[in-house]
């Protein structure tokens, strides 16, 4: 008998990706946010789980599950399974977590664990290569891919929480991330803007110790004629882009604004842009990634 999923079905997040990329961390973040979470659920049981959730009087409205490369049927049948669940009313999103080979090798070295696909006598790089090959098709159908190479545990948890929890109901979720080029460009960003053309408060002794959230630093940065012109033009550009992204079915946009260290200029400008967007009715999630780094 085929299970029936109502059109008011639960929100389902399928977490997948390479081993060591942070799937367990992402799952914990969603569990903390109130999702019903299952680790390594065989995909054949997902439809049954959704059917049972329909008899819980709304108690299970959001669920997340981890599926990895050892779930052979998911790798083969993922597109069909996800398509059928969506046709039956389930709100299914696939999040694929990735990281560079170097980062994965380092993480396995730190935990002293064997790679699950390394095989007898195989090395961690062997396992990584085998897993990438096995997951290639699944990566291709993911709604979003997040590269966790430069993210620590806390940054990944914040990112996942903002992605699936904050600002619910918005047709297009916008996240503004201030960052420092010194610490790397956010790999999950859709748009990257470089504001190092502006005078740097770092070289003003009385401003150097204070972040861009400090009114004195913000006044110094935003008081520049070029900063004002930049904000005007960027606001106009986003006013053009956001509805068109939305019309094309994009549900999430990350805009990264960077300066040298991520403490002064990018912070002030990201906050000012967030204020402008929110003033126009666009919900915004603001994250100052590197403001506390030295």
Curated annotation (Swiss-Prot):
Keyword check for Zinc-finger: no
InterPro entries per record: AAA+_ATPase, P-loop_NTPase, RapZ-like, RapZ-like_N, RapZ_C
Keyword ATP-binding among UniProt keywords: yes
A GO molecular function held by the record: GTP binding
Binding site for ATP: 17-24
Binding site for GTP: 68-71
UniProt cross-references to Gene3D superfamilies, sorted A to Z: P-loop containing nucleotide triphosphate hydrolases
SUPFAM superfamilies attached to this UniProt entry: P-loop containing nucleoside triphosphate hydrolases
Keyword terms of this UniProt record: ATP-binding, GTP-binding, Nucleotide-binding
Short name of one Pfam family: RapZ-like_N
Matches recorded under HAMAP family: RapZ_like
Function summary: Displays ATPase and GTPase activities.
Family to which this protein belongs: Belongs to the RapZ-like family.
Designated name of the protein: Nucleotide-binding protein AnaeK_0154
């Amino acid at each position: 008998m085929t299970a029936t999923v109502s059109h008011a079905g639960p929100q389902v997040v399928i977490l997948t990706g390479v081993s060591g990329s942070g799937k367990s961390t992402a799952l914990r973040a969603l569990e903390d946010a109130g999702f019903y979470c299952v680790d390594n659920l065989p995909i054949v049981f997902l439809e049954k789980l959704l059917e049972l959730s329909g008899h819980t009087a709304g108690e299970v409205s959001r669920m997340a599950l981890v599926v990895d490369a050892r779930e052979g049927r998911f790798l083969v049948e993922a597109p069909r399974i996800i398509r059928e669940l969506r046709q039956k009313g389930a709100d299914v999103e696939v999040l694929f977590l990735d990281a560079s080979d170097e980062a994965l090798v380092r993480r396995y070295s730190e935990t002293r664990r064997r790679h699950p696909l390394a095989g007898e006598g195989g090395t961690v790089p062997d396992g990584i290569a085998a897993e990438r090959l096995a997951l290639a098709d699944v990566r291709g159908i993911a709604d979003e891919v997040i590269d966790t190479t430069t993210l620590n545990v806390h940054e990944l948890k914040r990112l996942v929480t903002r992605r699936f929890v904050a600002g619910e109901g918005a047709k297009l979720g916008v996240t503004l991330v201030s960052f420092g080029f010194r610490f790397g460009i956010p790999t999950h960003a859709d748009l990257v803007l470089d504001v190092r053309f502006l005078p740097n408060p770092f070289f003003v002794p009385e401003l150097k110790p204070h972040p861009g959230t400090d009114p004195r630093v913000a006044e110094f940065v935003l008081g520049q004629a070029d900063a004002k012109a930049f904000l005007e033009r960027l606001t106009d550009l986003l006013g053009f882009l956001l509805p068109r992204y939305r019309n094309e079915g994009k549900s999430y946009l990350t805009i990264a604004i960077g300066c040298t260290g991520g403490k002064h200029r990018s912070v002030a400008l990201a906050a000012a842009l967030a204020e402008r967007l929110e003033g126009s009715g666009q919900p915004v999630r603001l994250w100052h990634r590197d403001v506390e780094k030295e």
